[in-house]
Amino acid sequence: MSVLIICEKPSVAKTVALALGAAEQKDGYLSGDGLLVSWCIGHLISMADAGSYDERYKKWRYEELPILPQTWKYAPTPGKEKQLAILKELLHRSDVSEVVNGCDAGREGELIFRFVYEQAGCTKPFSRLWISSMEDSAIREGFAGRRAGTEYDALYQSALCRARADWLVGINATRLFSVLYHKTLNVGRVLSPTLNLLVERDGKITMFHKEKYHIVHIGCGGVDAESERISDAAAADTLRTTCEASQAVCCLLYTSDAADE
């Protein structure tokens, strides 16, 4: 029987395969020593477009908003159909007894694998290869200590929530603002706040005016201090005069070994 490992990228799959002794190159995967090592190319499965839910959603109309799917649909990512077909065939091979999620150790890696596994209709047991190093020793150790895939169900659900939230915000908000302003305006959960940061920063640069300010410096035998920026020259001079007429007092002494820092 064989174990199928699915990695997130071809380069990672090759590194994992060579570390585990699967060096024979096939079409879309590597094999050897009882292992089949294949790969995704990022997301092979994506959230289906709104038009796939109902014909009326193929046109952008204000009256059809919001679009809130009750049952979610998925579709192959354009241009990646061949590798998806290879993975589906491997997942259903009779000699494959176990599937290993070898995608990147993180939320998105979990989603990339689960989408393929579930859309392929695979029911074989699957485990998780969770590694952050591409050293041969780390790969072999991670493979030997792989854990049941179900232990990462919460991570998968988190990734699924993120993907669906992106879809809901992106599809509905993009259509809404595009219809209202009569031109395509892309809106997204990450895109829009990021764009806002750039707009705010650009506005600050545009509205920036040079201002004079004053800082009062105090030197006390090697223990120096300084005030915040003071825009009023008279206030800064008053602070300087007050400090010159005063005596500095040590309120706290703290010592430490250099090794502790």
Positions of predicted regions on the chain:
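Intrinsically disordered, low-complexity regulatory segments
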Residues: 1-163, 167
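Long, highly charged, low-complexity internal segments
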Residues: 45-77, 89, 185-256
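A short, hydrophobic C-terminal helix/tail in secreted or cell-surface proteins
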Residues: 257-261
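Generic structural signal of hydrophobic/aromatic residues within well-ordered alpha-helices
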Residues: 87, 139, 165, 177, ...
